Structure formats: structure tokens, C-alpha cells
Amino acid sequence: MTTWNKCLKKLKKSLSTFEYKTWIKPIHVEQNNYLFTIYCNNEYFKKHIKSKYGEIISSTIQEFHDGDLLIEYSNKKFSGEKSPEVTSVGPQANFFNQKNVEIKDDSEETSLNQEPKKSQKKLSSKNSASQELFGFDEAMLITDKDDQEYSFGLPLKEKYVFDSFVVGDANKIARAAAMQVSINPGKLHNPLFIYGGSGLGKTHLMQAIGNHAREVNPNARIIYTNSEQFIKDYVNSIRLQDQDEFQRVYRSADILLIDDIQFIAGKEGTAQEFFHTFNALYENGKQIILTSDKYPNEIEGLEERLVSRFGYGLTVSVDMPDLETRIAILLKKAHDLGQKLPNETAAFIAENVRTNVRELEGALNRVLTTSKFNHKDPTIEVAQACLRDVIKIQEKKVKIDNIQKVVADFYRIRVKDLTSNQRSRNIARPRQIAMSLARELTSHSLPEIGNAFGGRDHTTVMHAVKAITKLRQSNTSISDDYELLLDKISR
């Protein structure tokens, strides 16, 4: 058995199946006494292998080779007779001083017993071929801690998991769909299109899908990115005349997750490339998950053929969570941070921060940090003081009659129509919206709200809240109206 075949045997056990087949197996190694020439086929492959696997290759060869050693990396194809199973891999090695070992490539040579040259530092930096072509480097590969398998794309953050996602009426359908596709990708809801305003949890759900899918199937090739990076990758592939590699990477995914897909609208070349990528993945039963700030039909400048394909699967919304869910988010976040947050303080913050979850958590962090530095408990008084420049604390609480007036003006009806017994659709729907807003924006009980709307029963209010919450999930017009009214009343 040759030295390299012995190395292969060990490398196959040391690396994951995915790594071995993807990066080691395609390479060829030629040995001439102390010289091992590693043929990597192209510059991209060579640089990635040197930067990622050079150390393990170097140490493995040293283990089976006696005497001096020179390892040479080449971006050329192997022209001689193919070895039984030849490969090459590896970042520039963090070399050992046991033997005189050198690493060499087409343009540089570095002795293991020397200080690295500037060119070596440059090579081992983020200026690898993959960084130049795809805009990501070794640190931006999705990594599973146990088996070290990699997929291209932006990194998935460990904190974004389903368990840390607080579920409420405004997001429960999206969360359920996300969980389903993470368990059975490509079989249900393909594509899954999640839309909603900024900071409402779309990215959290998307990354939770990736993290959970990797737990279910560690061998899955998961690519998570955003439209900005996708556009950059595509432009770079044209500049480097390597569109084939771009297509190979993105179309090899088992699960493709792209955040903020709306930004490819109007980018003709990128949109066309994404269209073909979508088709290739969809036809092969691969899962596609997309997020946007708008419903597909409402994305200005988006090609009709893409709008049509986005409708192949399931489209779900995430909306601003209601008061109870906002309180739950704050309490969970505080608990995760190891901090105690009184319920009344959580309620105060939730009542006054109604823009999005990101700002809600930001307000919480400010309250907790301020109270900690001042050695005080995070009371309502502390929250009022430190959030004065973040939220406009209303001099007086929102009143139901003000909600009724704003809603009536918005729908061009009379306030007395909202409190009347009329059941026509153009009156009943605004009435339900006004009740739902009153429930979210005031501290009034259900019976009190019902009484303010013509003496209605509390069950009527409950029904109205549930109906509007459900409609906001499926009806973009209702969802947009609700958000506009929420903004008007909260000013």
C-alpha cells in the first residue's frame, strides 16, 4: 500500500463522508520520493483545500512518510495515470517541527521552520477563492459541531432555534409550517414563503429551519443566505467567468434559504439566475424557503413567473405579536439572560413598544442594563426613566373612543355605526378591527370593551379578536390596514 493510500484510509475515518467525497476524493496526489504534488483541478479548489484541510493532510502524510517532505499544491489537472484514489486537501499547515517539511504551491514556498511570509498570510486570510467568488470564507460555512460537515452560505446562528421562538396568534401558523419543512424538506409546503414587517421573527424562523433540519439530517446540504449576498455572488461569478461554479454550489443544496428575496426585484440577470436555480431545486424535490417584507404579488418589479412559482407552496405571514405575546417574549428573553423581570415591568414595556420584536428586545436590554448598573430592580419607574428617549410614553392611555374615531375615519363610516346593531360587512369588519385594537392597546377587560361597543357580550369581543388575528394571517389587505391603524393610534 502506498503512502498516500495509507493517508486516504486515515483521512476517510477522520473526516465526515460529505467532506471526504466533496473535497478529498476529487483530487489527485503524485508522490516522487519526498515530493507530494497535490493536483486540485482549479484555483478555487486549491485555495479552499489549502486553507481548510492543509494541516490535517500535512500531519497525516508525516505520520506515514519517513524523512524530509515537500508538499506542493497545484491548480492544474492531473495529467498522468490516475492513482487508485487520490486526493488533496488542506489549509496551509500549522506545521510540526519533527521533520523538515515544506509546503509549496504554484506561486510560493514556505518552510515549516520559518516565519510565514507575507504572501502566506495573504493566502490563509479571507482572500481565498471561495471568498472572492462567493463572498464567504471558512468562518462563514455552516458547521455542525459533531461531524464538521459544511454547506456554503452565511452562518446559521445557534440562538435561532424553535425553542427560543415565542409563539402567539400572530405567528403560530408560520412557526408550524417552518417546523414541518425542517422535518420533511421538499415534501410539503415547497416553497415556504414567509412575509411580514421588519423585526417580527422571519429570520429567526428561517434559521431555526436550517438548524433543526441539520439536527434531523446532519448530511443535508443547507445553504442559508440573503438576497444581497446572492446578488453579490452572481455578479462575482460573472466577473470571474465562473458561473458554472456558482450554479453548482447553489443548485447542489438540499435546502435553500434566502432572506429578503424582494431585493432581487428589478435585477434582471440575478432574477433570471434565481429563476433557473429555483426550477432546478424544485424539480429535484429540494426545499426552498424564502422571506420577504411583502406578499409576493405586492413586491414591486418582481417578475410574474417568480410570483407564480412562489405560489407553488405555502405563503404565511408573521405579524406584530399581540400584547400577551409581547409580554411572554420579554419574560422569556429576561429568563434566558438570567435576569428577573417583574410582570408589571414587562407589561409596561410591551404596552409602549409596539413596532417590532427587535425593538422590544432592545428596550428590554436597556432596562435590564440600566437597573444592573444602578444596582436597582427593573421596576416600572426604572423602565420609564431609561426608555423616555426610546418610546414616547403617552401622557394618557389610549382610550377606546379614540380608537373608534380613528377606525371610523379610516373606513369612512360613523362612530355610531361601530356601536350600532348593523351587521353589514362594511360595518362589521371595521367593528371587529376596532375591538381587536382596543384589546391590544388598552388595559380594559373584555366586558368593558364589549360595553363600549353598544353593550356587546365579552364573547363577541373574543370572537372579533380571533377573527382579525386569523384574517391578518391570510389577508394582506386586512393586515396592512391593521398595521396602519396601529401606527395612527400609537402616535
From Swiss-Prot:
State the Pfam families in the record. Bac_DnaA (PF00308), Bac_DnaA_C (PF08299), DnaA_N (PF11638)
* Any one Gene Ontology cellular component term annotated for this protein: cytoplasm
The terms under GO molecular function for this entry are: ATP binding; ATP hydrolysis activity; DNA replication origin binding; lipid binding
UniProt binding sites for ATP: G199, G201, K202, T203
Q: Where in the cell is it found?
A: Cytoplasm
- Name the family: Belongs to the DnaA family.
- Under what name is this protein listed? Chromosomal replication initiator protein DnaA
Q: Which organism is it from?
A: Francisella philomiragia subsp. philomiragia (strain ATCC 25017 / CCUG 19701 / FSC 153 / O#319-036)
